[in-house]
């Protein structure tokens, strides 16, 4: 199949370099659907790690070009598709960081990421499901920045599935925050699980906040500040401090402590809350994680278990209530 320069040659000269790259990427992403036998080449297991190394060295564009040339001849390498999808996801995030300017825009990068990640899922790459879900959460972020939290929440459509134990984590985190509360998430895994959990459990009236985005993304900060009823010019810690007298703040196990206002925090289920919480009617469940721990070799099972481990470091009651999960390998906080 054609290399990247030949794909790029179909773009008119007046088109910007960003759009030129977008056309090239779009042409590449059509390759798996062409089903041309001539496009099939041997899978090279070294290409995906080489691309990852380039990205770590700050050469993401070179990594994408490498993957593009390679996947044009070896479209059945699922790990290479995963890397390509991740890199387009990172490009979308950079678009936010750079003031929501430039071409392609963030949504187009997310479209590219979704297409590449769906190829990795087709080829049974475990992490494809996780990163495909993150793409949907990032699309939700663009929706929040465009129309606000309430409208974005109401307008969400059914998203591609994620592993049940990840969804279960999100539901447990949301159920750990009292109704009307503000849930501060930390890791991408937590943010993903909570985003999906809020779709499955819309009756849980909890507002998720990503403090890292609040600190760095002006559009996100403006929309979420208005939702919380605070001044958008305030830094995240002061903004949350203004919210605390009116709404319970809930800090997830991986939430950045630097973003938390100086309040008396107390453990409640999987989170720490800014004021005493009324016992919730819904019980937590870890059945999906227990099932995955027995049946799956995915590293994401361990990552999800790690969130529960970190929660136990703040709430020793979890050492007994999650005894079935911890089993013979309890987290350090639960060891004698």
Residue ranges and their predicted role:
Residues 35-39:
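Signal peptide processing junction and immediate N-terminal pro/mature segment
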